[in-house]
């Protein structure tokens, strides 16, 4: 007997996601600010989308929302899906919100088990130490200057999950700077942890001398709307929880109170430019793109990519964001995909690498391709054409699907390294072209401890258990 089981592999959804010029400029501005903020709460829809929109687009900070859960314990206004299926919906809604407000999205493995009054119950079910380690590693990877929580670390949060998320933010800010904690990752010092409070919690907040006030009024010419309106549009992505809101373009204000640390959030929230190597390269690239100097924009953005590779991994959010902008500036379509999904289990996972020139005024060359079973250099380098070049590659990498295919492009003296994550690219008559994570479909062989007769005309039941390869 052979049973089929879907096991999801690489969880990347879509390598090629074209940017508009304004989106590319906004992303360059974030790289150029040198500022990084981590927003922490418990569930999808807990985050303050208006604040994330302001931080990402007015302050130009690299702003990430860390949601401890995926929201599988909530209700569903728009369908019958609950539990894990609801968690999938809420995760997609959360990512849709980030695509509107300009933030990035991260999760931990914490399970949303529904409402909880007790923080002790939360830590028992979540596993305090494991979640703490996940959060510290996220902080050390993203290197935020400040952490902002949606909730206070006490009973005012109104939900055990909420309280726990604020407690965790403070604990992990301290531990992230401790070189003796988790020596596998480098320590990082957060300047402070602040609570994004409101008059809902404290009606006298406006008169509190310890509260930091932020005027979020303002219009973003690149995005064509106010920061409040952008945040409201992002908020309305949380459809299954019924969080659609009307757009408000009027004045907006936010308040913050310090929970831990010595950093001055008030001074930090004043927009300015970073002076480190990454920020300066991003600023130069943005200026060149703004005045129409495409070649200089490519050169500076490519140089920034080399700097990033010295400090982060190719699959990191930051490098993948850099890569998306790089493809826009080059005017190149680049993608690695399979044309069927799921795929039968190894020993081969055939895929197609496509490279196509979209901007005919620029000469971009393919210099090399590196896959698990192919390391191909081209001498001389091959000019990308408008018809596109296709190359068959094998994604098989020691029993798994490889994380990425490395492609080296060249434009004049600029060297561009792309790390393309494989996806399944499919088409449907109702929805058109779409992408999904590649799934592997292994065969499971079953042995019975007694003889089994088929087609006897009698009904019977066969019971079985499925175990993973590692037991």
Language model feature labels by segment:
Residues 1-11:
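Bacterial N-terminal signal peptides
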Residues 13-37, 118-122, 128-335, 407, ...:
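Metal-dependent de-N-acetylase/amidase catalytic core
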Residues 14-141, 163, 170-174:
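Active-site rim/loop-helix segments in enzyme catalytic domains that contact anionic ligands
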Residues 341-348, 452-460:
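Short, solvent-exposed loop/linker segments at the N-terminal edge
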Residues 356-362, 465-471:
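Short solvent-exposed strand-capping/beta-turn motif centered on an Asx-Ser/Thr pair
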Residues 370-377:
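Short, solvent-exposed loop/linker segments at beta-strand-coil boundaries, enriched for Pro/Gly
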Residues 382-424:
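Eukaryote-biased detector of low-complexity, proline/serine/threonine-rich segments
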Residues 413-452:
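Short beta-strand elements
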């Amino acid at each position: 007997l052979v049973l089929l089981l879907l096991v999801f592999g690489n969880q990347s959804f879509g390598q090629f996601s074209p940017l508009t010029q304004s989106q590319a400029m906004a992303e360059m501005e974030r790289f150029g600010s040198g500022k990084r903020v981590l927003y922490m709460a418990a569930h999808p829809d807990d985050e303050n989308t208006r604040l994330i929109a302001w931080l990402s687009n007015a302050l130009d900070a690299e702003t990430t929302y860390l949601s401890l859960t995926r929201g599988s314990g909530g209700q569903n206004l728009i369908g019958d899906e609950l539990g894990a299926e609801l968690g999938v919906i809420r995760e997609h809604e959360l990512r849709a919100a980030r695509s509107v407000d300009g933030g990035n999205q991260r999760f931990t493995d914490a399970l949303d088990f529904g409402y909880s009054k007790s923080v002790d119950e939360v830590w028992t079910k979540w596993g305090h130490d494991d979640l703490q380690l996940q959060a510290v590693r996220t902080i050390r990877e993203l290197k935020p200057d400040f952490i902002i929580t949606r909730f206070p670390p006490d009973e005012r949060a109104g939900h055990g999950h909420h309280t726990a998320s604020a407690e965790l933010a403070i604990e992990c800010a301290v531990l992230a700077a401790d070189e003796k904690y988790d020596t596998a990752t480098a320590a990082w010092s957060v300047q402070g942890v602040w609570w994004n409070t409101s008059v809902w919690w404290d009606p006298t907040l406006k008169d509190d001398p310890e509260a930091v006030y932020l005027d979020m009024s303002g219009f973003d010419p690149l995005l064509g709307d106010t920061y409040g309106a952008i945040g409201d549009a992002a908020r309305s992505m949380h459809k299954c929880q019924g969080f659609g809101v009307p757009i408000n373009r009027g004045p907006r204000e936010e308040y913050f109170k310090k929970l831990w640390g010595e950093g001055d959030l008030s001074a930090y929230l004043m927009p300015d430019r970073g002076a480190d190597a990454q920020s300066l390269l991003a600023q130069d690239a943005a200026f060149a793109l703004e005045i129409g100097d495409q070649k200089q924009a490519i050169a500076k953005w490519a140089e920034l990519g080399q700097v990033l590779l010295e400090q982060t991994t190719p699959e990191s959010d930051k490098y993948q964001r850099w890569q998306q902008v790089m493809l826009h500036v080059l005017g190149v379509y680049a993608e690695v995909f399979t044309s069927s999904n799921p795929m039968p289990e190894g020993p081969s996972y055939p895929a197609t690498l496509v490279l196509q020139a979209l901007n005919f005024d620029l000469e971009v060359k393919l210099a090399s391709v590196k896959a698990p079973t192919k390391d191909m250099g081209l001498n001389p380098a091959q000019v990308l054409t408008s018809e596109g070049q296709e190359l068959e590659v094998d994604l098989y990498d020691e029993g798994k699907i490889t994380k990425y295919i490395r492609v080296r492009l060249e434009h004049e003296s600029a060297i561009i390294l792309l790390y393309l994550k494989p996806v399944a690219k499919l088409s449907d008559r109702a929805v058109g072209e779409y992408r999904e994570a590649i799934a592997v479909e292994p065969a499971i062989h079953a042995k019975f401890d007694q003889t089994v007769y088929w087609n006897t005309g009698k009904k019977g039941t066969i019971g079985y258990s499925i175990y993973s390869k590692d037991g």
